[in-house]
């Protein structure tokens, strides 16, 4: 019982999948820390791939019989799973959903409040990034088969996705960009709550100077829509060093693009946040060429006192302030990025000020604001 005799609402957490270390998983982790007694319901869970939830009560759906690598083509099975999940949730009062895809479709019982945290714009392979997905589904030699069936099914799947988006009581978006896209495609307004970032882990370098060999950096999964090819080509044309941290389906293609140039360095993986901070904090600038719903990596760079050169679209508009903690380039082209890098060279940034601009995205701030949203929604 809560103070005043009011019962403490029983909370359940629902998410699409827990199969890797990513932004959505960080959000789930933070929410569970806020509500430690809440069980987690998800369609797929890979304990071998992610150990954040070893001590949590995780309930997995029948979709888990499929390999996690097939996640992209499991939209229909996931939709079926989440459409019937309410049968297992009847004893809970508040359902908090962290949604990238279909989990927002979880039905609510009349006594329940549903708060859906949208980890990005409406399911992107149905809506805003449909053309990119059709062009390259990411299945190599099987792309033509996936492309054929996806084109065949996307119409009905969009209708289901729209219907699912009407079910939560409250929608919460991870950026102003995501909120605008939510209104555009789902015809629903969403409150904006920036996701938690480990800003305390990424700190200023102990020295004021950057590395003796100045370099730019980007940390990202190496997939086609991240447009890391633009960053590589811009640095090659500008004669600037670039360090790329990460791996992915495009890794080999990006290596071919870089050739034997000593300007480009690849680091497939850095497991330790402290090691990553040590590297990032020595960079001259962080290059962010993709259209992201939010973008955790640029915030981490800012927290380390490193200014960001970002495409003037997506979530970056919420936290990059021209001339204060970075600069923008207008078009997703090599030429536009090169021009921004030249402009960047003439700018002066103060590391303390750059770092301070990231502190508003702390985990503590996220939990405090989410608790307020939950209290507001459940008090009505």
Tell me the role of every PLM-derived stretch.
Residues 80, 332, 346-377:
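A charged, aromatic-enriched C-terminal amphipathic alpha-helix characteristic of glycosyltransferases
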Residues 322-323, 327-334, 341-348:
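Conserved acidic donor-binding segment of nucleotide-sugar-dependent glycosyltransferases
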Residues 34-104:
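Active-site donor-binding segments of glycosyltransferases and PAPS-dependent sulfotransferases
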Residues 307-311:
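Short hydrophobic beta-strand element within catalytic cores of glycosyltransferases
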Residues 203-226, 232-243:
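Conserved donor-binding/catalytic core segment of Leloir-type glycosyltransferases
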Residues 86, 137-171:
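Membrane-proximal helix-turn-helix segments that form the acceptor-binding/catalytic region
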Residues 252-270, 274:
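Nucleotide-activated donor-binding/catalytic signature segment of Leloir-type glycosyltransferases, i.e.
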Residues 216, 281-293, 306:
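Acidic donor-binding loop of glycosyltransferase active sites
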């Amino acid at each position: 019982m809560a103070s005043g005799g009011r019962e403490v609402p029983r909370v359940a957490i629902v998410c699409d999948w827990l199969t890797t270390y990513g932004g959505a998983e960080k959000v789930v982790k933070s929410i569970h820390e806020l509500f430690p007694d809440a069980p987690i319901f998800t369609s797929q869970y890979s304990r071998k791939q992610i150990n954040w939830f070893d001590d949590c009560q995780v309930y997995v759906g029948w979709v888990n019989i499929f390999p996690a690598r097939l996640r992209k083509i499991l939209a229909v099975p996931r939709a079926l799973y989440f459409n019937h999940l309410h049968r297992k949730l009847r004893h809970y009062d508040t359902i908090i959903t962290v949604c990238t895809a279909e989990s927002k479709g979880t039905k609510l019982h009349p006594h329940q409040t549903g708060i859906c945290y949208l980890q990005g714009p409406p399911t992107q392979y149905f809506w805003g990034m449909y053309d990119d997905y059709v062009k390259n589904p990411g299945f190599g030699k099987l792309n033509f088969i996936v492309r054929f069936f996806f084109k065949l099914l996307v119409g009905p799947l969009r209708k289901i996705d729209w219907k699912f988006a009407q079910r939560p009581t409250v929608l919460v978006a991870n950026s102003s960009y995501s909120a605008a896209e939510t209104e555009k495609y789902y015809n629903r307004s969403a409150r904006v709550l920036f996701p938690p970032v480990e800003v305390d882990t990424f700190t200023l370098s102990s020295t004021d100077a950057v590395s003796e060999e100045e370099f730019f950096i980007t940390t990202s999964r190496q997939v086609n829509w991240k447009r890391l090819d633009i960053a590589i080509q811009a640095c090659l044309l500008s004669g600037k060093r670039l360090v790329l941290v990460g791996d992915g389906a495009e890794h080999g293609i990006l290596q071919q693009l870089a050739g034997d140039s000593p300007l480009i360095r690849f680091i497939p993986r850095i497991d330790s946040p402290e090691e990553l901070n040590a590297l990032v904090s020595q960079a001259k600038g962080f290059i962010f060429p993709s259209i992201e719903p939010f973008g955790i990596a640029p915030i981490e760079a800012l927290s380390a006192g490193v200014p960001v050169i970002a495409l003037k679209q997506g979530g970056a508009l919420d936290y990059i302030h021209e001339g204060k903690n970075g600069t923008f380039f207008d078009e997703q082209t090599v030429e536009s990025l090169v021009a921004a890098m030249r402009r960047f060279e003439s700018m002066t940034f103060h590391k303390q000020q750059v770092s301070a601009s990231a502190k508003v995205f702390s985990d503590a701030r996220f939990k405090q604001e989410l608790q307020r949203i939950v209290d507001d929604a459940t008090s009505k």
